[in-house]
Curated annotation (Swiss-Prot):
Induction field: By heat shock and by intracellular acid stress. Up-regulated by HSFA2 and upon pathogen infection.
Enzyme Commission designation: 5.2.1.8
The protein's name: Peptidyl-prolyl cis-trans isomerase FKBP65
TPR repeat windows: 410-443, 459-492, 493-526
Entry comment describing in which tissues the protein is expressed: Expressed in the whole plant.
Alphabetical list of Pfam families matching this protein: FKBP_C, TPR_19
SUPFAM superfamilies associated with the record: FKBP-like, TPR-like
Cellular compartments per GO CC: nucleus; plant-type vacuole; plastid
Start and end residues of each PPIase FKBP-type domain: 65-153, 181-271, 299-393
Phenotypic consequence of gene deletion: Acid sensitivity and increased susceptibility to P.syringae infection.
Domain of life (superkingdom): Eukaryota
Region of interest called Calmodulin-binding, as start-end residue ranges on this chain: 539-555
GO biological process: cellular heat acclimation
Gene from which this protein is expressed: FKBP65
Length: 578
């Protein structure tokens, strides 16, 4: 029944570590409004609203320049969730009033107290405006954020313990700041408190995480913008500690034990390094920033210039789009026309961006030898691509479609999923079904006939996706998808069958039995369900045997001490008589 298909994702949301909207300098809200729980009021004169969910007894609120730490969930007005730090399990940190986030956040969060929870309704003018933030936020969208202010601290105290103090001498540009994997280029001069120079560079490049000179440099550059110049006061624990550092061949003076340092530091530039996959096996280093904010989505047609090299850095195995009369290399995303790692990396690029992509074998050519046009790639090879994204044409988003187009797009994704499923490509098929559902997930604007078609497509896509999840051994997700179907069609035997199958695999035998019995009530002659019922009975017998053995062993162990005590008592009795 898993293969018995009804024949009637968009790119995952990026984690907005810092939301990219420039802010005006003027502030509309400088004080915290007094609210009772459940009350809502407007902040400023631009339509920003705040509703208090949980109050706090403290009175102080953060100021511009403070680093705040929040948990949040962002939704559209129709309830569609587009982002959540709570789902990721990691609070979001940013510097208040510096343009790191949309203006509605900067204005709203400065009215909050530590521990407070509030819901902000943010009009498009204070959010992402006329352009929106594709693919998750449509143009002219009013947003709602459920925000909890966890903590904040002054960015002047970088580490929170007084170990590194930062004084900004020259403000940097824009709002971006380097992260752990980025390669920064800095200039610095380090001095003892008496002015003795103990370290200097007119230009050095290093990875933030790996550091350079002393731990304070890595801590500091993560708080700096491009072009920013600062004076750091560095305590020993972030300098050279209790042992100091000896002089080096007359080139650098010694650093005494427990010395405090003064460091002039300039962040000249950096190359952004991105972990494309969660397992860090596809890494992208941006050599040249791209234009705008849009990136290719699944189904997009992209054009590239690329050079592929082996790990030795000299062996070129592919080169496309670089000759004067040569057209860029073209492929369609999610059609297996290139290796998985390259495809994933390109989906995170902007038009005109140039990047160096490092791809481990799992996302490249695997454990087999692969003959490419210019060289043979040995088994288990890590490969490197230098890629320029020349242009791309995105697949149409759902909000750019009318209702009929959305239904047709959903049907097309379902058919594509069916083809992939029959070819045994279950993960890719699952993505097609998920994308199909997204087109028609919200159908409030559909007429009655369109709603019926939409419902049938949602049932088919979720049902077939559940079959994919069973094949991929993702049994919990298979059960969830089957439940979605049953919420729309409570007598759907296939959904009961697939959920029962999932429950059997997760050892939820009581739940599996309920689904199987219900399915047989509706369709007593269904062979597949009968086979599943047989499997259930066998599993129940197996578990009963295990339980019987377990309790038998446990009972034996409980009785053993009593037997031993009895024997000892008998022995003592004999000894006494003797």
């Amino acid at each position: 029944m898993e293969d018995d298909f009804d024949t009637q994702n968009q790119f995952p949301e990026e984690e907005p570590e810092e939301m990219d909207m420039d802010l005006p300098d003027n502030d509309e809200a400088d004080s915290a409004p007094y609210l009772k729980i459940g009350e809502e009021m407007e902040i400023g004169k631009s339509g920003l609203k705040k509703k208090l969910v949980k109050e706090c007894e403290k009175w102080d609120t953060p100021e511009n320049g403070d680093e705040v730490e929040v948990h949040y969930t962002g939704t559209l007005l129709d309830g569609t969730k587009f982002d959540s730090s709570r789902d990721r399990g990691t609070p979001f940190k940013f510097t208040l009033g510096q343009g790191h986030v949309i203006k509605g956040w900067d204005l709203g969060i400065k009215t909050m107290k530590k521990g407070e929870n509030a819901i902000f309704t943010i009009p498009p003018e204070l959010a992402y405006g006329e352009t929106g933030s594709p693919p998750t936020i449509p143009p002219n969208a009013t947003l709602q954020f459920d925000v909890e202010l966890i903590a904040w601290r002054s960015v002047k105290d970088i580490c929170g313990d007084g170990g590194v103090s930062k004084k900004i001498i020259v403000e940097g540009e824009k709002w971006e700041k380097p992260k752990d994997l980025d390669e920064v280029y800095v200039k610095y001069e380090a001095r003892l408190e008496d002015g003795t120079i103990v370290g200097k560079s007119d230009g050095v490049e290093f990875t933030v995480k790996e550091g350079h000179f002393c731990p304070a440099l890595s801590k500091a550059v993560k708080t700096m913008k491009r072009g920013e110049k600062v004076l750091l006061t560095v305590k020993p624990q972030y300098g050279f500690g209790e042992f100091g550092r000896p002089a080096s061949d007359g080139l650098q003076a010694a650093i005494p034990p427990n010395a405090t340092l003064q460091i002039d530091l300039e962040l000249v530039s950096w190359k952004t390094v991105v972990e494309v996959t969660d397992d860090r096996k596809v890494i992208k280093k941006i050599l040249k920033e791209g234009e705008g904010y849009e990136r290719p989505n699944e189904g997009a047609i992209v054009k590239l210039k690329l050079i592929g090299k082996l790990q030795d850095g000299t062996t070129v195995f592919v080169k496309k789009g670089h000759e004067e009369d040569e057209e860029p290399f073209e492929f369609k995303i999610d059609e297996e026309q290139v290796i998985e790692g390259l495809e994933k990396a390109v989906m995170g690029m902007k038009k005109g961006e140039v990047a160096l992509i490092t791809i481990s074998p799992e996302y490249a050519f695997g454990s087999s030898e692969s003959k490419q046009e210019l060289a043979v790639i040995p088994p288990n090879s890590t490969v490197y691509y230098e890629v320029e994204l020349v242009s791309f044409i995105k697949e149409k988003e759902s909000w750019d479609m009318n209702t009929q187009e959305r239904i047709e797009a959903a049907g097309k994704k379902k058919e594509e999923g069916n083809v992939l499923f029959k070819a045994g490509k279950y993960a890719r098929a699952s993505k097609r079904y998920e994308r199909g559902v997204k087109y028609i997930e919200y159908d409030s604007t559909f007429d009655e006939e369109e709603k019926k078609k939409s419902k049938d497509l949602k049932i088919a896509c979720n049902l077939n996706d559940a079959a994919c999840k069973l094949k991929l051994k993702d049994y919990k997700e298979a059960a969830k998808l089957s439940t979605k179907v049953l919420e729309m069609d409570s007598r759907n035997v296939k959904a009961m069958y697939r959920r029962a199958h999932a429950y059997l695999e997760t050892a939820d035998l009581d739940l599996a039995e309920l689904d199987i019995k219900k399915a047989l009530e509706i369709d007593p002659d269904n062979k597949e369900v009968k086979i599943e019922y047989k499997k259930l009975k066998e599993k129940v017998k197996e578990y009963n045997k295990k339980d019987a053995k377990f309790y038998s062993n446990m009972l034996s162990k409980m009785l053993e001490p009593h037997k031993g005590t009895q024997k000892e008592a008998q022995a003592m009795s004999i000894d006494t008589k003797a």
